[in-house]
């Protein structure tokens, strides 16, 4: 039985990537097998996949979800939209010296007022005066992860989105997908690798460390996903033909496994709190492309469950010694599912 301290590691600060590389597919790729680590360029992913394999991407689009504002009492606030509920309402985190009262107005971006509603846990309901997506796009700022030290600029607005981002709703990018450019997608298709898409709106909880030493006590954050019947059909056809189901990122993995709890993948939409730790039996995904994750994070636990705890520990030690770039703008790994015990 693993505990929180088993997922801690020391990372030199200079290995946290602060900016993306000039070319998406120029990142490094660590091919990981038990007791075998191979350093590759990310474009080599074409050679690691076979005709008939299926790549499953998350097509969520990152919202410009960060706002700075002023309460009607004059106090400064920072707002991070966590989830769009409907056309006029959102759930959001609010940072302020004093918690805002229900009914209070907050002026955001010196452009429009929102009204504070009820609080549930760490989130407030906020009512927007007009279409949420239009106001966010016009006045919000891209919410870069907390370990990136610069404010988002126009370059980030392009590079912190995947080239196939389509469905707005995330507050963090599905970062494994950032390595794919159109030329690489075309090369994969030309080889006979199939492409499919799910949507999972990544929440701010993805950056939160687990705080309970006993992992069973962790309250997993919730994220919304949807999987189409078309994607389900592609997955099942690939499985029948003996191809690999390759999740592009932990968010695609989480959606696919959440929708497979009955034993086989089902189409539909739902909120998921699936917390994958070592001992979990994977039902759909056989390969995983993923970036390097934060210490004590749920994502580090997920990849340890998938490829094996000792294998991941060795991979991270190798990556640090070889000066791989870590986290959202960093390099990637190609993982194979550990055989069930």
UniProtKB/Swiss-Prot annotation:
Pathway: tRNA modification; tRNA-queuosine biosynthesis. InterPro entries: QueA (IPR003699), QueA_dom1 (IPR042118), QueA_dom2 (IPR042119), QueA_sf (IPR036100). It holds the Pfam family Queuosine_synth. SUPFAM superfamilies: QueA-like. GO terms for biological process: queuosine biosynthetic process; tRNA wobble guanine modification. The keyword Cytoplasm applies. Keywords: Cytoplasm, Queuosine biosynthesis, S-adenosyl-L-methionine, Transferase. GO terms for cellular component: cytoplasm. It is found in: Cytoplasm. Its main location: cytoplasm. Its EC number is 2.4.99.17. It comes from the Bacteria. One of its GO terms (molecular function) is S-adenosylmethionine:tRNA ribosyltransferase-isomerase activity. HAMAP family: QueA. Transfers and isomerizes the ribose moiety from AdoMet to the 7-aminomethyl group of 7-deazaguanine (preQ1-tRNA) to give epoxyqueuosine (oQ-tRNA). Belongs to the QueA family. This is S-adenosylmethionine:tRNA ribosyltransferase-isomerase. It comes from Janthinobacterium sp. (strain Marseille). The gene is queA.
């Amino acid at each position: 039985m693993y505990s929180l301290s088993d997922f801690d590691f020391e990372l030199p600060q200079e290995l946290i990537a602060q900016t993306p590389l000039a070319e998406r597919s120029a990142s490094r790729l660590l091919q990981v097998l038990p007791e075998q680590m191979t350093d590759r360029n990310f474009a080599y992913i074409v050679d690691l996949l076979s005709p008939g394999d299926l790549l499953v991407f998350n097509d969520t689009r990152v919202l410009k979800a960060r706002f700075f504002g002023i309460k009607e009492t004059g106090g400064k606030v920072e707002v991070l939209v966590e989830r769009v509920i409907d056309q006029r309402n959102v759930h959001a985190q609010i940072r302020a010296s004093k918690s805002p009262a229900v009914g209070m107005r907050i002026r955001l971006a010196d452009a429009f007022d929102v009204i504070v509603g009820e609080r549930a846990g760490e989130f407030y309901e906020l009512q927007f005066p007009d279409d949420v997506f239009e106001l966010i796009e016009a006045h919000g700022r891209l919410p870069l992860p907390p370990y990136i030290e610069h404010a988002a600029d126009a370059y980030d607005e392009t590079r912190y989105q995947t080239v196939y981002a389509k469905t707005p709703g995330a507050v963090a990018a599905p970062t494994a997908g950032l390595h794919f450019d159109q030329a690489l997608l075309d090369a994969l298709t030309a080889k006979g690798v199939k492409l499919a898409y799910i949507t999972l709106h990544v929440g701010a909880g993805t950056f939160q460390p687990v705080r309970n030493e006993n992992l069973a006590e962790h309250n997993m954050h919730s994220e919304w996903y949807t999987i189409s019947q078309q994607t389900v059909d592609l997955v099942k056809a690939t499985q029948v033909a003996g191809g690999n189901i390759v999740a592009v990122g932990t968010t695609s993995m989480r959606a696919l496994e959440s929708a497979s709890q009955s034993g086989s993948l089902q189409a539909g939409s739902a909120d998921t709190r699936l917390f994958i730790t070592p001992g979990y039996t994977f039902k759909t995904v056989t390969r995983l492309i993923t970036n390097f994750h934060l210490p004590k994070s749920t994502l580090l636990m997920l990849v340890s469950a998938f490829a094996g705890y000792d294998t991941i520990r060795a991979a991270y030690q190798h990556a640090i010694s070889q000066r791989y770039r870590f986290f959202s703008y960093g390099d990637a790994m190609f993982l194979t599912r550990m055989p069930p015990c």
